[in-house]
Amino acid sequence: QGFVAGVNAARKLKGETPFILGREQAYIGTLIDDLVTKGTNEPYRMMTSRSEYRLILRQDNADERLAPIGHELGLVSDETLQKVVGKYDAVRREIKRLEHTGVPSSDALNALLTSRGTAEVHDGSPLIALLRRPQLTYDDLRDFDAGCRAFPPALAESVEIAVKYEGYIRRQMAEVAEFARLEHRAIPEDIDYAKIDGLRLEAREKLAAIRPQNLGQAGRISGVSPADVAALMLYITSKTQD
């Protein structure tokens, strides 16, 4: 947080807008948001479990998330940014290729599948379907496809993670977008927090005592976690649809 404070001190002297990292952008964003909105009575320890967005705050995509921000701050050169952009363009192109490239059934392929404890293929299979299997890795595909053999090993992990966790990542990105849209959504004045499943006891008591007007205020109450806010948001949405 010292780095962020230094950046913002310099930006304030220049009359520029503050540099703020969101919870969905970096763990330091989670740390600062927790300290500012919730406070703490003891040393704060940043653990991955504190972030509700840890699926998208991964080590392998840190450059994709933060290089554009660093470039805006003048800390990342044009050349470095273009390398990062090129890297993830290549990853996306490879995923698209895996979707449209099939591998025929063969004794060698089925022997591999059997040895890994997964079902054989009898009519061939798209490469991406094989990679989605938990038992297989991208490197396993290199023996059956020239394109995979030619693909840079340094990028293979990013392809594998994107493919294997595609559904979970897409769901979390949708949660980020939805929560941003509903952050200022009003909370009914007559809401009964005792009826909301998923709220922890501490959160229920704090919300009932403070009576926040919207979800943004609720999320900034000490003792109310992002999971509590998500439960509250789901409850309000369900009542609106009734």
Each language-model region and where it sits:
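Mid-to-C-terminal Rossmann-like scaffold of FAD/NAD(P)H-dependent oxidoreductases
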Residues: 15-69, 73-78, 82
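Alpha-helical scaffold segments in soluble metabolic enzymes
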Residues: 8, 30, 34, 231
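Short amphipathic alpha-helical segments, especially helix-boundary/capping motifs
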Residues: 6-9, 29, 41-45, 179-184, ...
